[in-house]
Design a protein with these regions (language model features):
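Glycine-rich, hydrophobic membrane-spanning regions of integral membrane proteins that mediate transport
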Residues: 1-431
Length: 431
């Protein structure tokens, strides 16, 4: 993997890679160090307790948060496959059938009819998958809602409710061992774990009875892994506040977790847009495309030789006609690389996948805009290289700014908040 590939991955705010870099490599170590520093202002013992709790909390939570949802979804997909359904069938295709005229370019019935004409085995298998879902829509929707519930509820319960209880129990045990010289009549609060039976009953009941309306099921099916992580982060906030050892710790957890959600899922998107807009204005270039595209020699050569083929317009029909009829065009290849469209091994578009027309239209606009800007420059190759370097710098700057806010500003602000509400620098739960 090249440096450009790595930068491209961490610059994709729709994926988990930016979260992985910020959370594990920068945010967690910084939070641990700040927690130790602030608690040491009160005592070394509290600093040790805070450090241990923070190490367990940060890294175990990161492992569950970043790995839990993808892992559960993978298991759920295997389960759905064993039941005879292909989890690649996007439920949004049912909603597309309601469109009329030139706006109707995809859908369950539409795709079955359109792609049945192909004799390729992978296409016929895909059509068979569509027919199976069409004939058993209610059953398939239940599988999708169960998948969503499992992928969000299970990690959230573990991170938000189980882990804090275990962490607090460990701290109490350490304190008991530390204070063995105290009189025997000094009582310590016992740890009450979550009721396993109750959790099991809850999970079975939810997976048996949970039913969402078609529209909501379609919305759920459209959620990316990073969207589900944001939802689980909201549940994590509720869990951390509700399991707090006292109200002061609850206030601090609410302050910390809400700030973290904003800085993880909202701020980076606006920082990226702002940096790209600033770069376009300052350097008179176009940095809206991904670095992988800007670094592609075939793409640059095609611009120089005026061999780039594009859809006639941004209309749904023109876009879909183009990607279906010209799968080997640079536009279609990059659309697939950027996950705007998916092709089967035979080169035919996968009829089970939903194509976000608005997203594809925006991509076409950015693609065309860069080509026009490059042609207007005196040196296309130099223009593209400059755009790539600036885009990479923007991505790294975004990671740096976001990480500074998450790993430096937020923890410092949290301890200022704790000092303001408690009069002490130590974590409220360690009182």
């Amino acid at each position: 993997m090249t440096i450009t590939n790595i930068i491209s991955a961490i610059g994709n705010n729709s994926s988990i890679y930016p979260l992985l870099v910020r959370d594990c490599c920068i945010e967690a170590p910084s939070k641990i160090l700040i927690a130790r520093r602030e608690n040491s202002k009160e005592s070394q013992i509290k600093a040790n307790d805070a450090t241990r709790e923070k190490i367990i909390d940060e890294y175990v939570t990161s492992a569950i948060w970043l790995g839990g949802i993808p892992a559960v979804e993978k298991l759920a997909d295997k389960y759905i496959s064993k039941k005879g359904y292909n989890p690649n069938v996007n439920i949004n295709l049912f909603g597309e059938e309601k469109k009329e005229g030139s706006s109707l370019v995809q859908g369950i019935e539409y795709n079955i009819k359109k792609f049945s004409q192909y004799s390729n085995k992978d296409v016929q298998d895909a059509v068979a998958d569509l027919i199976k879902v069409r004939d058993n829509k209610a059953v398939y929707e239940k599988f999708l809602t169960k998948k969503f519930a499992a992928a969000t509820i299970i990690p959230t319960l573990i991170m938000g409710f189980v882990l804090p209880k275990l962490n607090f129990a460990l701290t109490r045990k350490v304190k008991e061992n530390r204070n063995t010289q105290l009189p025997l009549n000094v009582s310590t609060k016992s740890f009450t774990s979550l009721n396993r039976t109750r959790f099991s009953d809850f999970y079975e009941k939810q997976n048996k009875d949970i039913v969402f309306t078609g529209g909501l099921t379609s919305t759920i099916a459209s959620l990316r892994t990073v969207d589900k992580m944001a939802i689980s982060d909201g549940g994590l906030t509720v869990g951390r506040v509700s399991t707090s050892r006292n109200k002061e710790e609850g206030y601090a957890n609410a302050f910390r977790m809400i700030g973290s959600m904003i800085l993880n899922f909202v701020t980076p998107v606006y920082i990226a847009k702002g940096l790209d807009k600033l770069a376009n204005k300052l350097f008179k270039i176009n940095v809206n495309l991904d670095p992988l595209i800007l670094d592609n020699e075939e793409f640059i050569s095609a611009i120089k030789e005026n061999k780039i083929e594009l859809p006639k317009s941004n209309s749904p029909k023109d876009l879909m006609d183009f990607i279906d009829s010209k799968p080997n065009s640079l536009f279609s290849k990059f659309a697939q690389k950027m996950k705007k469209v998916s092709y089967l091994k035979s080169g035919i578009r996968d009829p089970r996948k939903f194509v976000d027309i608005n997203d594809l239209s925006d991509f076409k606009t950015e693609f065309e805009s860069f080509i026009d800007s490059a042609r207007a420059s005196k040196n296309i190759e130099k223009f593209a290289k400059k755009a790539k370097y600036v885009k990479c710098a923007n991505i790294l700057a975004n990671v740096g700014i976001s990480s500074f806010l998450l790993a430096g500003v937020l923890p410092a602000a949290t301890y200022k908040f704790i000092k303001l509400t408690t009069g002490s620098y130590s974590d409220p739960g360690l009182k």
